[in-house]
Structure formats: C-alpha cells, structure tokens
Amino acid sequence: MGLAVTALFTHAAAYEDMLRAIANGDNGTVSSLLQKGMDVNTVDKEGESLLMKAAKEGNMNVLKTLLSAKPKVAALNSFGESALMMASIKGHLEAVKTLLAEGAQIDHAGWTPLMYAASMNRVEVMRLFLVRGAKIDAANATGLTALMLAAREGQTQALLLLMEYGANVSTKAPNGYTALQAAKQRNNDEIARILVKAGAKE
C-alpha cells in the first residue's frame, strides 16, 4: 500500500514539474521528464494534453521536444479544442506552422482553428490557414462562422482578410444570426459599415 501511494504521489509531483517546466520554457526539464518515462499524452481533468499546454505558451524548443516524443497531435480536450487551436488563438505563428507540419488538422467539425484566430485578430495565422485552403465559411454547431466571430469581437483586420479571401458576408446561422447583426449588437459600427458596403443583409 505504501509503495502504491508513494508511486502515485511521485507521478503527481512529476506532472506538476512538467507543467511548471512548460510554463517556464524549461526545455531541459521537459526533456528529462520524458526520458524518465512520462507519457507525452498525459492529460489533465479537462483532457488538455502537454502538447496543448505547450502550444498555448508558444515556446518552440519545448513544443519540438514534446513533438519528438510522438504525441497525439490531433487530440481534442473536453471542450473540443486541439493544440493547433490553442496556438492559433494565441497567435503563435511558428507553433502553428510546426503543428501543421506534424499533421495537425486545419478543418474539423465544430470550432476550427480559423475561428479561434479570427476571434482574436491573429491575422498572420489566419492568412496561413486561408492560403492552405481552410474552409472559410465553415460553421460551428450553433452556425457561427469565422466572419461572424470577427464581426462580433470587433476584429476589423480579421474581417477584412476573410472578405479578401471570399467569405460570404450574408451567411445566416440556423437562428437567423448574421455577421451584420453580430456587429450591430456589439456596437461595432465600423465593421457594420464595411459589411453593409459589401452587400451584407441582416
């Protein structure tokens, strides 16, 4: 019994060390813990993997070390988020490029990396996705598109980029919600004017 408890606490302590190392960009400790046998696919109670945590931080050395241990790159947490989505919303362009090179998916059901990037105005990340053929008018379960999110969050540059690549300005969610409505509800007047000029309807 004592040995089992000791092993449990030892594992928990090692996991905390790993989380701290990822947050601090301590690549040496990350590498050491992996070499000692920590499972690279270890997740927390919300299903967030070590790779997802590293993707949020954007430290390339740590990210590459974790990737060298062959984690599940396309894994999703309990909220349907991937490592690529987390790198996208933070605007970590190099991390995004590296994850794509390792097989991360640009498009999948539900929220997409493009939507995450658009909501935070991560224009360079968005451009990369669009150049690589991301589905620009893809909608999540409630019918929101990247354009609607950009309009709602007041992200003018993101909105203009999406329009440049041909986003449909008049798409409606199942409940009738449009990008123009999103802009008006949040008093994003400049975006509303841009959408109206482009022919958007409520």
List the predicted regions and their residue ranges.
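Ankyrin repeat boundary/linker residues
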Residues: 44, 77, 107-110, 140, ...
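Ankyrin repeat domain, specifically the short helix-to-loop turn at the C-terminus of the second helix
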Residues: 31-39, 64-72, 97-105, 127-135, ...
